[in-house]
From Swiss-Prot:
InterPro entries: ApaG_domain, ApaG_sf, Uncharacterised_ApaG
Biological processes per GO annotation: error-free translesion synthesis
Name of the protein described by the UniProt record: Protein ApaG
Domain spans labelled ApaG: 2-126
PANTHER family: F-BOX ONLY PROTEIN 3, POLYMERASE DELTA-INTERACTING PROTEIN 2
SUPFAM superfamilies, per the entry: ApaG-like
Annotated source species: Shewanella frigidimarina (strain NCIMB 400)
Domain of life: Bacteria
Length: 126
């Protein structure tokens, strides 16, 4: 695979889902909204995802699969694609990170890295 520079910028917003969580059973639910921005001059297509979810105990859950939320979106130049998904952890704080396997308009594959971001129950660090 050739080295193709990624024109992708990724923004993440997270939310603790208190109503769906069961603290007594150590089930903490979080949603995350991802915005994938194509800063390049050509369209790109998201082909697959790879997540590493790490809780406060250091337990890791790895998730791989095609697309995101059932889609393999094509993102036009200077536009964005946004989706919301969720995860459950056994601790009130943790981290997610990963990557998207992308394809450019020439059919060349490249990786868009998702930097680590924190999932935390509000007030946990006060």
């Amino acid at each position: 695979m050739s080295q193709v520079e990624s024109p992708i910028k990724i923004k993440v917003d997270t939310q603790y889902l208190e109503q769906q969580s069961d603290v007594a059973d150590n089930k903490y639910l979080f949603s995350y909204t991802i915005t994938i921005i194509n800063l390049g001059d050509n369209k790109v297509t998201l082909k697959d995802r790879h997540w590493i979810i790490t809780d406060a105990d250091g337990e890791q859950n790895e998730v791989k699969g095609p697309g995101v939320v059932g889609e393999t979106p094509t993102i036009a130049p200077n536009t964005a694609y946004q989706y919301t998904s969720g995860t459950v952890m056994e601790t009130p704080v943790g981290f997610m990170q990963g990557s998207y396997g992308m394809e450019n308009h020439k059919g060349e594959r490249f990786v868009a890295t998702i930097p680590p971001f924190r999932l935390a129950v509000p007030g946990i660090f006060q």
